[in-house]
Amino acid sequence: MGIFVCRNSLRMLNVRWLYHRCLSLYNSNHGFNEAKIKEKLAQFTGGSVDLSKMDNGIAEICINNPSRMNAFTGTMMIELEERISDLENWKNGKGLIVYGAENTFCSGSDLNAVKAISNPQEGMMMCMLMQNTLTRLQRLPLISVALIQGKALGGGAELCTACDFRLMTEGSEIRFVHKQMGLVPGWGGAARLIHLIGSRHALKLLSGALRVHPENALELGLADNILLGTEDGFLSEAENWIMPYIKGPSDVSRAVKKVIISGREQKLEDALRTEKEIFGTVWGGLANLQALAKGTKHK
Ligand SMILES: CCC(=O)SCCNC(=O)CCNC(=O)[C@H](O)C(C)(C)COP(=O)(O)OP(=O)(O)OC[C@H]1O[C@@H](n2cnc3c(N)ncnc32)[C@H](O)[C@@H]1OP(=O)(O)O
């Protein structure tokens, strides 16, 4: 019995490991040494990445390092990866809101860590970790929203592009400040920005390190809405905003996000095949049968 349990747990661990390997971009075949870069990043402490999962199927991730305008320390990069793993295993989840503590989003990577990891090899290794994590965030079967209050700078601007939607509050800004730091985005923010607003607009934002205010972001298609409420109400406003998109049973909501991911990321023929597979998971399912039995009309 003990051996059986042990073997089963090992199989589960293997499946989980393989699953993460599939969702991630980089592994040891790409020269990525995850353990080594995590060991290095663990030296840069401070702040936290907090996850709460609610009964209504919405989770919240709080980037929490307000004394440094929610900059990502090394330990926070490691924690973000752990929180995404947790969400990958949350089978009832439907939505995710990513926000920053104390009414500002995130000021990018912690400059103390940036200074200490100044050689290109370690810099690229840190990028691989963050690209893996943010790609996994983007591929979660949850509808995700970045709630941007205050500033989303550098890596903070990159983080918000990994969410499906961006809600900005009045006076907030998204700014790819990398060029002013002698850098380019490395957490996948340039590639994702081009998908969102096209290469001409992306080039302007990156080469001019332009401040993108809410109205401008809305026009560009970078933001999806501007929230006009008060500081203590923005989280619940974001929750209300996401609600119509996650209404109904989680398996259907998750299937919707999955067909979007495959349509976005795969070649047409592969995407069509994946879509058929996902369709098979909901066809004849409980929600489908209930809708048929009710004679649902769409007036
Ligand atoms: C992936 C690559 C990247 O992310 S490169 C981009 C890195 N980020 C930056 O360069 C942002 C640098 N910070 C700033 O421009 C300003 O601090 C901003 C965010 C505009 C806030 O200005 P302000 O409202 O005047 O506040 P402040 O400068 O007094 O900051 C408060 C305390 O927070 C700190 N802080 C801020 N950002 C970071 C950061 N990224 N890394 C480490 N610390 C940061 C400031 O140093 C300041 O700390 P202290 O109160 O002086 O101890």
Swiss-Prot record:
InterPro entries: ClpP/crotonase-like_dom_sf (IPR029045), Enoyl-CoA_hyd/isom_CS (IPR018376), Enoyl-CoA_hydra/iso (IPR001753). GO terms for molecular function: carboxy-lyase activity; methyl/ethyl malonyl-CoA decarboxylase activity. The keyword Cytoplasm applies. GO terms for cellular component: cytosol. Keywords: Cytoplasm, Lyase. It holds the Pfam family ECH_1. It is found in: Cytoplasm, Cytosol. Its EC number is 4.1.1.94. It catalyses: (2S)-ethylmalonyl-CoA + H(+) = butanoyl-CoA + CO2; (S)-methylmalonyl-CoA + H(+) = propanoyl-CoA + CO2; (2R)-ethylmalonyl-CoA + H(+) = butanoyl-CoA + CO2. Gene3D superfamilies: 2-enoyl-CoA Hydratase, Chain A, domain 1. CDD domains: crotonase-like. It is an enzyme of class 4 (lyase). The keyword Cytoplasm applies. Decarboxylates ethylmalonyl-CoA, a potentially toxic metabolite, to form butyryl-CoA, suggesting it might be involved in metabolite proofreading. Acts preferentially on (S)-ethylmalonyl-CoA but also has some activity on the (R)-isomer. Also has methylmalonyl-CoA decarboxylase activity at lower level. Belongs to the enoyl-CoA hydratase/isomerase family. This is Ethylmalonyl-CoA decarboxylase.
